């Protein structure tokens, strides 16, 4: 047994991130990921070791020996798959290859992670990859030990899928534009679990000297681009990617607000400090193994729900309209049939400043689609599982004294959810 107490301890006194093992849960069917993210953020930048089949809901299995690349969004601990957007992979050597031949072996003793940071040595291209993140943007640092045709694969077709056919057909449209030699922007629409639109801006700290577009299969619409750089062995390439649901301008605003320069160590430290601030809210006594178990679970609980609204509060809602969140932030990734029992009660205790935002997000989505989210993702509805557990989440928040939302609006969407038939609610009409 171990003791537990909430604290107001200054984060500088103890580094609680030392007790987080981001690889826990990443074995077969644990469906967690080891990469870098911020609490409740849009971005989760993490390695991909596979993408096809239920085993790869998070795109990573600890025992795998090949890394496909690094994607910028991930689901954490779910039993369904989606996201896995914008795969990038540093490569060297022959540029024109089959789309799946840029993957690399990696030694497990050269892979490491801590909250907000991930690193690995990629054996085949001879590159050290490092990842960190802000809430809406990822920042990568690649050190090319071998600079022969130093390049980056940008794969916009990629995404976790149930089978090979879906993997090669999930992208419905893909538009890209090189705004200058260092900036790529784009818009991708895809459909795996939910219909998703995302916009992005990708910037490099040095100019692209050549691009190669790989051939696409008949069912593919997502582009695969090889961007090549003039580099010497030992030099670093920095790349940052910001995303938005609203448009390229939204992605640019997110990048400018959060990662305006190329200070990798600064972003990494800010990510560490934010995680430590949250983790320091609970102090436990016990063995190091018990602390690792506890703080890793605490960490995983704070990865979602995810703020998908831009830094200025705008987001794409369930009707594909661009609107501004009522309280400044809109959250999605609500696996409510899982989280209503323990996670949401936990949030009311440990992150009370987030609770009103969660409730307002549920209410806003309900007012658009006609009923409370069942399993909300990327601002849309997946219609996954039965019942509607958002009711208890809102009721609990109100019962515990949270008043940062309109109680009458909340009651009306609860009533509408429970008493009105909605043809969009799959095959379980309430009569």
List PLM regions with ranges:
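Accessory carbohydrate-recognition regions in carbohydrate-active enzymes
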Residues: 9-392, 398-431
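C-terminal motif of bacterial Sec signal peptides marking the signal peptidase cleavage site
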Residues: 2-3
